[in-house]
Amino acid sequence: LDGTIHCFGEGLPNQKVHPKSPESVADVQPVATQLAASILQESEVTDGYAVVLGLSNEQLVDELLRTSKLRIIVVDSGSARMNALRQRLMTAGDYSDRLQLIVGNPDSADIPPYIANLIIVSDEASAPMDSGERVKRMFEILRPYGGKACVLTPDGKDAKLLSHASPGTLPGVKT
């Protein structure tokens, strides 16, 4: 069981190598590339663990895998969306041990405390940050002393999120 394949027969088999066809740069949405670059630059986090709550932009996950050393945990309640991402990455040969896809509620997923160097809430609809409990849960996952959170909020939701994540409501928080 060491991964060796033995073939018994006459002559040498014809070997055919199937090269991996890289995704064309034209296929990558510039928005995803810019967003990933912006998140990595602003957070100054390029390795460790990232937890992505909600999967509104699959290419953001692709770009984070491609441009960082982050181990990424994605939590989303859409099983069809997660399976499609898993199949696409496996077909392309890009599904790696650096990526874990968890189908479940981003609000109550069983994620260990203090694991995330970076948390990205990419789908505010599936993981809305409109309650203090949700924000508190997010900070329970976040690594103390340097963990960063990036919440991509629709226009006008920033003030409500900041009211739940202000230094007065959560100890040690800087906004």
Language-model regions, residue ranges each:
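A short glycine-rich, Lys/Arg-flanked "PGG" loop and its adjoining helix->strand segment in the class I
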Residues: 128-148
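Conserved SAM-binding strand-loop segment of SAM-dependent methyltransferases
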Residues: 93-106
